[in-house]
């Protein structure tokens, strides 16, 4: 950011990952945890977290998002995609690049035509994310004789709703057959019998009074 300026310019390093939803659908791929969509994606940053907890800054963010959304859905994005596609496709689908293109020509057209719809979906996710609990961190499990205790941070909600938690322990990451499963926990801690030596996975999900859910950062 420039010196002697009251405005900060924050540029994400992963802009190359933007507008990938349609491509991921075509490849049956998902790179995102539940919390990585909407404002919860920034909750792990202390500065952003404090800003999001302040109504003044949330309103300022909403104004900026709404302004950007209006620009991206006024027809210009379709025009840009059409213009760039006409310029780039002849080169992309000719040698040697053609050997490394992850999409067919028809799939390329589908992705290009889906950009505005992705913007609309992302805007809806942004709005909805305020209705969900924010993600949280799970502490390091502690073994005590024949039991193990696990604690985690409280899940924040913007409406100060009551939150309950479910806890699962499994020996495989899909949690298809959990060894331990507890639901309706009202405090962010639980205990269970010490399992046999091995590799285990923990999952904690927060649920607010309205039924909205959120996973921990660590899940």
Regions flagged by a language model, labelled:
Residues 4-157, 162:
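Middle-to-C-terminal accessory/interaction subdomains
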Residues 16, 172-178, 197, 209-211:
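Asp-box/BNR beta-propeller loop motif
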Residues 155-178:
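Solvent-exposed loop/turn segments flanking beta-strands in beta-repeat/beta-sandwich domains
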Residues 180-186:
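Short beta-strand segments within Ig-like beta-sandwich modules, predominantly Fibronectin type-III
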Residues 192-199:
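Surface-exposed, short loops/turns at beta-strand junctions within beta-sandwich domains
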Residues 209-219:
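Extracellular fibronectin type III
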């Amino acid at each position: 950011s420039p010196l002697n300026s009251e405005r900060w310019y924050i540029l994400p390093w992963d802009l190359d990952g933007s507008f990938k939803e349609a491509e991921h659908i075509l490849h049956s791929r998902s790179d995102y945890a539940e919390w990585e969509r909407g404002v919860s994606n920034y909750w792990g940053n202390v500065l952003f977290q404090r800003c999001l907890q302040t109504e003044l800054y949330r309103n300022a963010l909403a104004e900026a998002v709404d302004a950007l959304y209006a620009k991206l859905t006024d027809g210009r994005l379709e025009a840009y995609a059409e213009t760039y596609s006409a310029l780039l496709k002849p080169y992309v689908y000719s040698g040697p690049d053609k050997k490394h293109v992850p999409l067919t020509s028809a799939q390329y057209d589908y992705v290009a035509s889906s950009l505005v719809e992705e913007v609309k979906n992302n805007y809806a996710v942004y709005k909805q994310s305020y209705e969900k609990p924010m993600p949280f961190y799970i502490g390091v499990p502690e073994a005590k004789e024949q039991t193990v205790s696990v604690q985690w941070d409280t899940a924040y909600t913007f409406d100060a709703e009551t939150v309950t938690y479910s806890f699962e322990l499994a020996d495989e990451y899909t949690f298809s057959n959990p060894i331990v499963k507890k639901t309706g926990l009202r405090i962010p801690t639980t205990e269970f019998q010490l399992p046999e030596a091995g590799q285990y996975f923990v999952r904690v999900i927060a649920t607010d009074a309205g039924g909205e859910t959120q996973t921990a950062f660590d899940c």
